[in-house]
Amino acid sequence: MKYYNDISIIIITYKSDQIIYKFVKKIPKKIKVIVVENSKNLVLKKNLEKKFKNVKVYLRNNEGVSSSLNYGVKKTKTKYFLHLSPDLQVDYNDIKVFFYYAKKLRDNFCALGPRFLKTKKRGHIQIDKKLTIAKIDSIHGSYMFMNKQKFNKIGGWDKKIFLYFEETDFCYRAKKMNLFCYQINKIKTQTIDTTVKIENKKLRQNWLNLLIWHFIWSKFYFSKKKNGFLISLIIFLPIIIRILFRIILYKITSDKTKLTKFKFRLNGLYNSIKGNKSFLRLNQIKN
């Protein structure tokens, strides 16, 4: 397709060895692919670049999704880029649909995204199924079509956010600049795999606790940017009370797993309220 010369695909990986080969294999060979590899897997880099000539892998310290995407965008030389998570089902014929609407909108947009299938309504807001295309507050960060110039104009993703709410913050800032997000219902995707695979049970639990910590940290951080500190404190007060109640409950019932989970949640929220960085990393969590 003629569109392939004007787009790059950016994939961010972290301990994604088991799925990345299968995912990259399905990408048309004429599309440039940039892989930002955050677990510094040199073997993965060598094998991917040897097997797929359209792929370039960059090894980095894990500084989070935002920092990684910003880095990947800097490495692109095309007008547009598609940020994809390797756990998704993607039909690359849909690229022509993205280009059609990008042209129709005269590139005056923040991001374009697909309709996600088999998702929970509460956790993933989407436009009405009957619509062809419509504005939406935020496009899911795992599948975003963007214009590089507009991405840079908006200021990229906030590198202070390690994980979660990166796209929400980005789309919020874009909206204030009258650059809107659009969901295209003709383009569909769904999650078919797991991005991070950790076999060790204890390490897997540590990973889940890390996600809990960063989710609440980022949630308050974004709320503070949007609503201000005092209003955010009021909004989060019921959450703080629920967390403290759960900690007391699981201490009484001696449920160590759930107790640890809510301690991580409380700690993440505490550090975000204090204005501390999203510092927690997997290797810092001890069993």
At which residue positions do the language-model features occur?
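Acidic donor-binding segment of Leloir-type glycosyltransferases
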Residues: 24-58
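Non-catalytic, C-terminal membrane-associated alpha-helical segments of glycosyltransferases
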Residues: 210-218, 229-287
